[in-house]
Amino acid sequence: MSSSRVGLRLAACLLNVSEAGRKYIVENIAKAALLDKNGKKHPQVSVLNIFSDQDYKRSVITIATSVDKLGLAEDLVLHVPGCSVFLFGEADLPEKRSLVQRRKQLGWFTRRDFSALQPDLGAAPSQRCGLTGSEHGFCFALFFFFF
């Protein structure tokens, strides 16, 4: 039996944060993704995973939501100065570049002057933190894709 109902289109966000030692900070950032400005839970937003690497002092928070909720990325860049958002996959229209293609294009694993890069949303990357620039002691890089 097949269903004619179209499933929910999802988007995922890989939020890279330059913090791993203070677990409560990473958890608070993850909780912030789940709540609206009134403290109520967004019904279609989930934190799928939190990975913290003590050696590299960074954490990656994987967030999934309905494609309809992608305005959250725009809200985030307004409320977190220095946040850069790079889109890939179905979110990267019209090119639809994969994460690997975007990282190569951005020189993600090479030393380069990131100040010339323009993110899809948010501030240009800073020299201090590279692609994950922020003025608040945290460094953020967001990648959005649809699946």
Swiss-Prot record:
Question: Keywords, A to Z?
Answer: Signal
- State the coiled-coil residue ranges: none
Family per UniProt? Answer: Belongs to the formiminotransferase family.
Source species of the chain: Homo sapiens (Human)
Q: Top-down, what is the taxonomic lineage of the species of origin?
A: Eukaryota, Metazoa, Chordata, Craniata, Vertebrata
Q: Which domain of life is it from?
A: Eukaryota
User: What InterPro entries does the entry give?
Assistant: Formiminotransferase_N, Formiminotransferase_N_sf, FormiminoTrfase_cat_dom_sf, FTCD
Q: Which PANTHER family match?
A: FORMIMINOTRANSFERASE N-TERMINAL SUBDOMAIN-CONTAINING PROTEIN (PTHR12234:SF1), FORMIMINOTRANSFERASE-CYCLODEAMINASE (PTHR12234)
What's in the GO CC field? intracellular membrane-bounded organelle
Can you say what this protein is called? Formiminotransferase N-terminal subdomain-containing protein
Q: In which tissues is it expressed?
A: Widely expressed with highest levels in liver and skeletal muscle, and moderate levels in kidney, bone and pancreas.
Molecular functions per Gene Ontology: folic acid binding; transferase activity
Q: Which residues form the signal peptide?
A: 1-20
